[in-house]
Amino acid sequence: MTKQIQKTVSVCIIGRPNSGKSTLLNRIIGEKLSIVTPKVQTTRSIITGIITLNDTQIILYDTPGIFEPKGTLEKAMVRCAWSSLHSADIVMLIIDSLKPLDSITHDILNKLRSLNVVPVFLLNKIDVESKYIDDTKAFLAENYSDSLLFPISAISGENVDKLLEYITSKAKIAPWLYEEDDITDLPMRFIAAEITREQLFLGLQQELPYKLTVQTEKWEELKDKSVKINQIIVVSRESYKTIILGKNGSKIKELGAKSRMQMQQFFGFPVHLFLFVKVRELWEDNSDYYEYMKI
């Protein structure tokens, strides 16, 4: 029997916050792996997505949005995004076509040039009419003629098939790094924490979601094939804890129920989820939390 020739290619997706990086990764692998919310800076670490198409395994790195960081956590997130370039065969810069090119995007372009990186441009959100798209295309064509440009819609899937054809064409003969049906190399504990953090981002107002982190403290497989999960929501102030708990614990019950449903849908087995809130002042300056968050 002839052994199948295996090919691999790795791709990192960088860009400003809320430009569509996580949505694109989820679209390509066909699963909701990377959490998505309307709030900026939802992604804090590199999320690895994997898809195997025929003889080619594609490894995708979704990264934190690049912006002007202020605090210790934000600086760590931006460093994490830039570090992904070293692991990738292809660097893709995703640009929101609904917005004009701003100073941060120009800074990203300049840094890529200083690193001698020729990115592939993804002009995202073309499913919505934009008054900026023609100017953006003209600027990129004039100043970055060596780069390819793909107008896409990560949310509708428009032109994503053409993008995949290009990515596949760049694969090199090499053994696959993962099993054929793997979609990520992230631990289930980490994914579960991300699912809960997504619900906190969606369910809490203003700045509070940025002031917390989630850790899966316990993962116990039970005899009936269900899993008991204990998670800690870490906040820096007692007032934040009060908000998350809600009146008579109503808010945390609501958030827990939504998180549990998402976990069951993703993992495919029953989940018993227990959430606890702990106050840890200045947790954002503690590197132990960064290690758990993979940044």
Curated annotation (Swiss-Prot):
<dbReference type="GO" id="GO:0070181">
    <property type="term" value="F:small ribosomal subunit rRNA binding"/>
</dbReference>
<protein>
    <recommendedName>
        <fullName>GTPase Era</fullName>
    </recommendedName>
</protein>
<comment type="function">
    <text>An essential GTPase that binds both GDP and GTP, with rapid nucleotide exchange. Plays a role in 16S rRNA processing and 30S ribosomal subunit biogenesis and possibly also in cell cycle regulation and energy metabolism.</text>
</comment>
<dbReference type="InterPro" id="IPR004044">
    <property type="entry name" value="KH_dom_type_2"/>
</dbReference>
<keyword id="KW-0547">Nucleotide-binding</keyword>
<dbReference type="Pfam" id="PF01926">
    <property type="entry name" value="MMR_HSR1"/>
</dbReference>
<dbReference type="GO" id="GO:0005525">
    <property type="term" value="F:GTP binding"/>
</dbReference>
<dbReference type="InterPro" id="IPR015946">
    <property type="entry name" value="KH_dom-like_a/b"/>
</dbReference>
<keyword id="KW-0963">Cytoplasm</keyword>
<dbReference type="GO" id="GO:0005829">
    <property type="term" value="C:cytosol"/>
</dbReference>
<dbReference type="InterPro" id="IPR027417">
    <property type="entry name" value="P-loop_NTPase"/>
</dbReference>
<keyword id="KW-0690">Ribosome biogenesis</keyword>
<feature type="region of interest" description="G4">
    <location>
        <begin position="124"/>
        <end position="127"/>
    </location>
</feature>
<keyword id="KW-1003">Cell membrane</keyword>
<dbReference type="Pfam" id="PF07650">
    <property type="entry name" value="KH_2"/>
</dbReference>
<feature type="region of interest" description="G2">
    <location>
        <begin position="41"/>
        <end position="45"/>
    </location>
</feature>
<keyword id="KW-0699">rRNA-binding</keyword>
<feature type="binding site">
    <location>
        <begin position="62"/>
        <end position="66"/>
    </location>
    <ligand>
        <name>GTP</name>
    </ligand>
</feature>
<dbReference type="InterPro" id="IPR005662">
    <property type="entry name" value="GTPase_Era-like"/>
</dbReference>
<dbReference type="GO" id="GO:0005886">
    <property type="term" value="C:plasma membrane"/>
</dbReference>
<keyword id="KW-0694">RNA-binding</keyword>
<dbReference type="InterPro" id="IPR006073">
    <property type="entry name" value="GTP-bd"/>
</dbReference>
<feature type="domain" description="KH type-2">
    <location>
        <begin position="204"/>
        <end position="281"/>
    </location>
</feature>
<dbReference type="GO" id="GO:0043024">
    <property type="term" value="F:ribosomal small subunit binding"/>
</dbReference>
<comment type="subunit">
    <text>Monomer.</text>
</comment>
<feature type="region of interest" description="G1">
    <location>
        <begin position="15"/>
        <end position="22"/>
    </location>
</feature>
<keyword id="KW-0472">Membrane</keyword>
<dbReference type="InterPro" id="IPR005225">
    <property type="entry name" value="Small_GTP-bd"/>
</dbReference>
<dbReference type="GO" id="GO:0003924">
    <property type="term" value="F:GTPase activity"/>
</dbReference>
<feature type="region of interest" description="G5">
    <location>
        <begin position="152"/>
        <end position="154"/>
    </location>
</feature>
<keyword id="KW-0997">Cell inner membrane</keyword>
<dbReference type="InterPro" id="IPR009019">
    <property type="entry name" value="KH_sf_prok-type"/>
</dbReference>
<feature type="binding site">
    <location>
        <begin position="15"/>
        <end position="22"/>
    </location>
    <ligand>
        <name>GTP</name>
    </ligand>
</feature>
<dbReference type="InterPro" id="IPR030388">
    <property type="entry name" value="G_ERA_dom"/>
</dbReference>
<feature type="binding site">
    <location>
        <begin position="124"/>
        <end position="127"/>
    </location>
    <ligand>
        <name>GTP</name>
    </ligand>
</feature>
<feature type="region of interest" description="G3">
    <location>
        <begin position="62"/>
        <end position="65"/>
    </location>
</feature>
<comment type="similarity">
    <text>Belongs to the TRAFAC class TrmE-Era-EngA-EngB-Septin-like GTPase superfamily. Era GTPase family.</text>
</comment>
<keyword id="KW-0342">GTP-binding</keyword>
<feature type="domain" description="Era-type G">
    <location>
        <begin position="7"/>
        <end position="176"/>
    </location>
</feature>
<dbReference type="GO" id="GO:0000028">
    <property type="term" value="P:ribosomal small subunit assembly"/>
</dbReference>
